[in-house]
Every structure is written in C-alpha cells, then in structure tokens.
Amino acid sequence: ENGVDPVPAHTPVLYDDQRLHLVTLSRLVPHKRIEEAIDAVAGMDGAVLDVVGSGWWEDQLREYAAPYGDKVVFHRHVSEPYKHALLERAELHLLPSRKEGWGIAVIEAAQHGVPTVAYASAGGVADSIRDRETGRLVQPGEEFGEVVGETLGRREAMAPAARAWAARFSWEETGRRFAKVIGALN
C-alpha cells in the first residue's frame, strides 16, 4: 500500500484572478508529455495551466508554450504549502504521461477534491484513479483534450469522491491496512 503526507496545516491563499486553473505536477522531461496538457488548455477561454516542477526539458516547454502567453505559467519547484495552494485553486490535475508509476500527485490533488485526467495505459497511475469517480482515465481512441473538457463539466460531482479516495492513503490508514495484512499472516 502507498501513502501520502497530509495537506500542510498552513497554505497560502492565492489571489482569485477569476480564471479557470488547471495544474500539472511533474518533472519536465519529454516522456511526461506536458505539451498535451498545454494543448488541452490552449483552446479554453479564460483557462490557465499551472506547471509545477522542473527538468531538462523546461526550455523546450517554455518555447512550446510561448504562443499562448499567460495561459501557461511555469512555477518550477515550489514549497509544499505553495504546491497545495495551487492544487486547492485548481479545477483539474492533468497527467498526460504515457508511462507513470503509482500517482502520488494524483492523490495529492484528490486531497483537495481535484480530479485527475491521465492515460489508462500509463501504468500504475490507473491504480490511483477510480475512472469516472475520482478522475478520468483516457482510453485508446479518446483525445486527451476532449476528456479534459468533459471532466471539467463533472468536477463538482467528482470532488467528494476524490477527497474520500485520498483519505484512504493517509499514513494512518495505510499503516492500519498493512498491520491487518501482517496480522493475517500469524
């Protein structure tokens, strides 16, 4: 079982700019395919993609995003409280990677009631999203951007399930389940 740290007790309150914020938490390397998240937001009126993370592909991503101006904001590495403030403000978390392990970032977003859109074929991330309940797993033949748009329309309905799902992965709950497994071996 996996666990995640709790939301910090004190997080900054971010200015409400009346824009629709989507967020991606990722290392900035080619296989994470952040370009797909940029493309998904580029056509949305009043939307902003907050890109949190850094990596050797950052300059290429900044160049790719340049035509979209302030629709894409690169935050680089941020403190835990600031990361959670960005998640709290977000409507969706986008994870367009085609190869991913279990999704800690998915659960961190879910702690704030923020659903994640990711590829079903990405691997372990499919274990951290309950498709159509806590987020969306993009299936073969579906377009990432279209699924993002569809999921935005269901965000409020998914938020309570996302929060409840994330609570399963507190260290306390993870430890309780682990102890139960060990106890069953005796």
Give, region by region, the residue ranges found by the protein language model.
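Carbohydrate-associated surface elements
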Residues: 3
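Conserved acidic donor-binding segment of nucleotide-sugar-dependent glycosyltransferases
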Residues: 130-142, 149-154
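Conserved donor-binding/catalytic core segment of Leloir-type glycosyltransferases
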Residues: 13-32, 38-42, 50
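Short alpha-helical donor nucleotide-sugar binding micro-motif in glycosyltransferases
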Residues: 77-78, 85-90
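Short hydrophobic beta-strand element within catalytic cores of glycosyltransferases
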Residues: 115-119
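Aromatic "clamp/platform" in nucleotide-sugar-dependent glycosyltransferases that forms part
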Residues: 98
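Nucleotide-activated donor-binding/catalytic signature segment of Leloir-type glycosyltransferases, i.e.
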Residues: 61-78
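A short, well-ordered alpha-helix in the C-terminal region of glycosyltransferases
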Residues: 156-169
